[in-house]
Design a protein with these regions (language model features):
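Repetitive, compositionally biased segments used for assembly/scaffolding
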Residues: 25-110
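Bacterial N-terminal signal peptides that target proteins for export
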Residues: 1-9
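Bacterial N-terminal signal peptides
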Residues: 9-20
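Generic extreme N-terminus detector
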Residues: 5, 21-22
Length: 110
């Protein structure tokens, strides 16, 4: 294998990893993760969740406000035991998204 073919192979491998790294774990600007709108009724489960969530104090992907009714805006979550819009699992490492609880101005972080 020549040096130029090795470089071409290395470059191809590096470029193929860029799209996967840039989209992994990202919340879109309009508040979706993997097609799930990040507002609504949420159920916490111990396994097989739609989204793995880590609670952080700084640099969140999403700012979440707990509400008791009408979780209509992105970042407004109503925690329920039945009929959820999506499920989450709290994790300490390797989350799909990171959230921070807030009392006002929920939504996607800039």
């Amino acid at each position: 294998m020549t040096l130029s073919s090795k470089l071409l192979l290395l470059l191809t491998l590096l470029l193929s990893m860029i799209p996967a790294a840039s989209f992994a774990g990202s919340v879109t600007k309009d508040g979706y993760y993997n097609g799930i709108k990040l507002c609504g009724k949420v159920k916490v489960v111990k396994s097989f969740a739609d989204i793995k969530v880590q609670v952080v104090k700084s640099f969140p992907d999403l700012k979440v406000k707990k509400v008791n009714a009408f979780p209509d805006q992105i970042g407004e979550w109503q925690f329920v035991d039945s009929f959820p819009d999506f499920t989450i699992q709290f994790v300490d490492s390797f989350p799909d998204i990171k959230i921070q609880y807030v009392n006002s101005f929920p939504g996607v972080s800039n």
